[in-house]
């Protein structure tokens, strides 16, 4: 059995959630991957966040309940997966930027880039606004991994608010590519 992250986890401050997601496992249907990179987008003052321009049909999920998926399309071709954070009414989300896709064989595959993650896992806009705290086929779970070694850098792929060190990265994921899958929960 596996331990799905609860709403209370996502209700915390976004920067705490972003760093704490490192080493957790993203489950989507039959796929599972260890999260190795995240970025935080926080509030209406964050010029790089979709919420900067206020509440819209597109950003409504960011203002909603913590723990819900926020999936959108960029450049008309790439889907990006975020999970909503902070209390309802405050717009914030964490972008999942990189994972180690687990398989029965090693080395496991590094999937870097939010568009590549969604393409590999087949996540699309139809997976937007799903409660990831109550869905056993689309969720994030605890693992037995302790990730203490991570770095904070400016967010990438944006042109505004580049001074914020809100990107969290496990600097060397080589060991995770050879991780024993017994250290992570199994699907039941």
UniProtKB/Swiss-Prot annotation:
Source domain of life is Bacteria
State the Gene Ontology terms under molecular function: alkylbase DNA N-glycosylase activity; DNA binding
The answer on whether this UniProt entry bears the keyword DNA repair reads: yes
Q: Write out the similarity annotation.
A: Belongs to the DNA glycosylase MPG family.
- Transmembrane feature ranges: none
Q: Which NCBIfam families match?
A: 3mg, PRK00802.1-4
What HAMAP family has UniProt attached to this entry?
3MGH
EC number in record: 3.2.2.-
Source species, please? Ehrlichia ruminantium (Cowdria ruminantium)
Annotated Pfam families: Pur_DNA_glyco
**Protein name stated in the entry:** Putative 3-methyladenine DNA glycosylase
Keyword list (alphabetical) reads:
DNA damage, DNA repair, Hydrolase
């Amino acid at each position: 059995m596996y331990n799905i992250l609860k709403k209370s986890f996502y209700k915390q401050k976004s920067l705490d959630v972003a760093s704490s997601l490192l080493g957790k496992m993203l489950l989507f249907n039959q796929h599972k991957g260890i999260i190795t990179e995240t970025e935080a987008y926080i509030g209406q003052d964050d010029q790089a966040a979709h919420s900067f321009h206020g509440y819209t049909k597109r950003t409504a999920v960011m203002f909603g309940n913590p723990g819900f998926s926020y999936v959108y399309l960029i450049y008309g071709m790439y889907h990006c997966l975020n999970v909503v954070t902070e209390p309802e009414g405050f717009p914030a989300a964490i972008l999942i930027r990189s994972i180690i896709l687990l398989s029965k064989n090693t080395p496991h595959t590094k999937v870097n880039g939010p568009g590549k993650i969604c393409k590999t896992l087949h996540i699309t806009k139809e997976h937007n606004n799903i409660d990831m705290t109550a869905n056993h086929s689309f969720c994030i779970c605890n693992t037995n991994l302790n990730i203490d070694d991570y770095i904070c850098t400016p967010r990438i792929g944006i042109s505004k608010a580049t001074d914020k060190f809100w990107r969290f990265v496990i600097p060397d994921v080589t060991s995770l590519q050879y991780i024993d899958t017994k250290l992570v929960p199994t699907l039941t």
